């Protein structure tokens, strides 16, 4: 939270990403991440880790949705796979690393959750709930559309300008 020294939630996420050997999955309604988080996700994908991020296919806030999408291209160009959940708005905040460690809580992958708000999360390791989280991710991937390919190419100039402007305000969203 804002009254502590350090950014514990981001540190947990970064450590999980860095330690991943086989896969790292994340589900988050908002993807507005720091350069450090972007770099670690990309490095994990480049070293052969299956990195997948699920965001909503149906937005609750259109500006935040477009800002979230502005983070896709740099990630997918370096091997991260992006999915959008199609049945509705996905509000889960969970991660799964190598089928051994997971997080569940209120912490979004965004500036407000990671740096400004008081949030709660549970770090799980080697317990029965891990299997259930893995099954949940399998179901999520089944009903989500992978949008990785459409973000590998060039985006229109207008869209890039809009996304650059939105990113200026990202810490406020």
Question: What label would you give each PLM region?
Answer:
Residues 23-25, 30-173:
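PLD/PLD-like phosphodiesterase catalytic module centered on the HKD motif
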Residues 1-12:
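Active-site cores of enzymes that catalyze phosphoryl transfer or operate on phosphate-rich substrates
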């Amino acid at each position: 939270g804002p009254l502590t020294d350090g950014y514990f939630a981001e540190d947990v996420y970064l450590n999980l990403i860095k330690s991943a050997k086989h896969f790292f999955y994340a589900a988050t309604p908002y993807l507005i991440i720091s350069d450090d988080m972007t770099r670690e996700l990309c490095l994990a994908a480049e070293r052969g880790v299956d990195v997948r991020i699920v965001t909503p296919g149906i937005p609750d806030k259109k500006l935040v949705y477009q800002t979230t999408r502005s983070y896709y291209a740099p990630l997918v160009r370096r091997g991260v796979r992006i999915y959008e959940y199609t049945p509705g708005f996905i509000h889960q905040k969970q991660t799964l690393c190598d089928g051994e460690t997971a997080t569940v809580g209120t912490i979004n992958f965004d500036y407000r959750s990671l740096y400004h708000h008081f949030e709660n999360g549970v770090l799980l390791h080697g317990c029965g709930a891990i299997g259930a989280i893995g099954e949940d991710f399998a179901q999520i991937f089944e009903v989500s559309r992978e949008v990785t390919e459409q973000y590998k190419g060039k985006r229109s100039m207008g869209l890039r300008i809009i996304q650059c402007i939105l990113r200026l305000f990202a810490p406020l969203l």
